[in-house]
């Protein structure tokens, strides 16, 4: 599997959409479960998982085929989870500061 993964990564690096689709098919479910475990929300996990693959495609020129693809998508998705939690905390803090009118 490792050789196939490396071959797919080389092809993705060269903008091969079929290879990207194959990586997506091979890794999406595992990544989705990984993200659901972190965020405890399947809709949010789906958004983060899709954004992760979008970022892989956008930065495909920087791919290193010798490295584990799952490690890459796990790192990207973890960073996206952290971003979500940070933004949620800020949003919550601002919502708490809004005075309630009419009560």
What are these regions (language model features)?
Residues 2-5, 91-103:
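Internal acidic/polar
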Residues 10-31:
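A short, charge-rich alpha-helical start-of-domain segment used by transcription regulators
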Residues 13-14, 53-68, 88:
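Sigma70-family region 2
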Residues 21, 33, 43-47, 67, ...:
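Residue-level preference for short helical/loop micro-motifs built around acidic side chains
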Residues 24-42, 59:
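Amphipathic, Lys/Arg- and hydrophobic-enriched alpha-helical face
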Residues 61-65, 78-95:
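Arg/Lys-rich amphipathic alpha helix in sigma70-family domain 2
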């Amino acid at each position: 599997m490792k050789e196939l993964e490396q071959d797919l990564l080389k092809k993705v690096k060269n903008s091969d959409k079929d290879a990207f689709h194959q990586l997506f098919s091979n890794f999406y479910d595992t990544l989705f479960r990984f993200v659901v475990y972190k965020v405890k929300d399947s809709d949010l996990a789906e958004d983060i998982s899709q954004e992760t693959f979008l970022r892989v495609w956008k930065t495909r020129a920087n791919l290193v085929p010798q490295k584990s693809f799952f490690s890459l998508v796990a790192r990207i998705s973890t960073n996206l989870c952290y971003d979500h939690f940070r933004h949620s905390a800020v949003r919550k803090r601002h919502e708490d500061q809004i005075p309630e009118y009419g009560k």
